[in-house]
Amino acid sequence: MKNKYYPVRTSMDEMNAKNDNEIDLEKGPLPEYNSEDGSTLPPYSENLNLKDPKQMGANNPNLFNTDESTTPPDYGEDSLSNTHRENHSSGTADNSSPFLIKLLISFIPIFVLNVPAVCYLTYKDALFKDYGKDEWVYFGVWCAICLMIFISLWCFYETWTQAVAQCVKVTVIFLAQCIKVTVISLAQCVKVTAIFLAQCIKVTVISLAQCVKVTAIFLAKCVKVTVISLAKCVKVISIGLFNIRREMMIIIWILWLIICCILFGCVKDGRLNFNKALICSTCTISAVLFLIVSSVCIPIWTLWRALSGMLQVLGIHGIIAVLVNGLMSLFGKHFGWRGYEIEGFVLFFTSSALFLYEMERPGVLKRLRNTTGNVIGYICGGIEDAFRRIKNAFRGANDNNNIPLGEMDVEGEV
């Protein structure tokens, strides 16, 4: 059987030959192609603009001839072997990397491995310096190891590069997942923190509102109580001064303030000592109170009541003076003021308050004295009852100690 040679021609070659030699009866003669202005396209260029080969064949039905009567060309063995060899060689050339690139990439790990050692030896000034037999042997062994590693990397280039690529890919995916998880976690943390801060701000605002509300109510009550107290004070003063002369009362209070200022000024200047200040303050207060009572021309029973209240006020003054004197003698070093200054102010305010209170409610000091006596009596009675109970407890303990031993044994058997 003879080997016949048939030229390999594809349908694309036939189409090109047709386009070159034949004229399409439907489309007419080929137009001239002007490449300068680009206004006229190449002949039958619609087939070139189609990306799908099926669409290209649809426009030209003679492009892919599937007639069963057409017999395929008889290819020879030589042509088949040459075609297979060309395809195999072209595929190998496409899949393999260039030789220099393989050498370069294989040498990079060796270079990276030796750079730290060279840098360290250079830093220690020991690179190829004073090398002996052992050092050169170590150097040769190291070079041999590096050469073996280089050869291994070059021979197994495809394997380790794919492994490195997979490692890099896995690392990148892992880092991406870590970044994603971190971002999500941070977003969740920010969200939770924002909600927590919002709740804290809400609770704080509510608490502040409650505090402001309570404070406002408390201040309103304080203002109310203060206004009521001032109103009562005004009422007390108006009732106390109802039957006396207004001009005389004003003069008396002005004289009282002048006397007190002179008294405290003299005491502060050192011209009066403690005892003189006590006597002067007591006498001044008594004189002023007596002047107020005697200048209004009140009935005798009212005068007697005022004198009684004045005596009670003087008694309270004496008690306060004794207490202040004792405290000053014990804690005098811890006070900035001296004793007579404190006593003078105490006497001034106490006398004024008690006098006005006695004028508003006659006999209140007497009732206060009786109430104080009752309280002291109650306290003393409680102390007496406590001592009586303690005495009874000790008496019962002594009675138990006097029981005979025989009676105690009988009680134990029972």
From Swiss-Prot:
Positions of the UniProt region annotated as Disordered: 1-94
Entry annotated with the keyword Cytoplasm: yes
Keywords assigned by UniProt, alphabetized: Cytoplasm, Endoplasmic reticulum, Membrane, Toxin, Transmembrane, Transmembrane helix, Vacuole
Biased composition (Basic and acidic residues): 11-29
Transmembrane segments: 99-119, 136-156, 170-190, 192-212, 222-242, 247-267, 284-304, 311-331, 339-359
GO cellular component, one term: ascus epiplasm
Keyword Disulfide bond belongs to the record: no
An example Gene Ontology biological process: meiotic drive
Compositionally biased region (Polar residues): 57-72
Pfam families: WTF (PF03303)
Subunit structure, as described in the record: Homomer. Forms protein aggregates. The two isoforms can interact with each other and with themselves. High sequence similarity is required for their interaction.
Function, in words: Promotes unequal transmission of alleles from the parental zygote to progeny spores by acting as poison/antidote system where the poison and antidote proteins are produced from the same locus; the poison component is trans-acting and targets all spores within an ascus whereas the antidote component is spore-specific, leading to poisoning of all progeny that do not inherit the allele.
Family (UniProt): Belongs to the WTF family.
Protein name per Swiss-Prot or TrEMBL: Meiotic driver wtf19
Protein's organism: Schizosaccharomyces kambucha
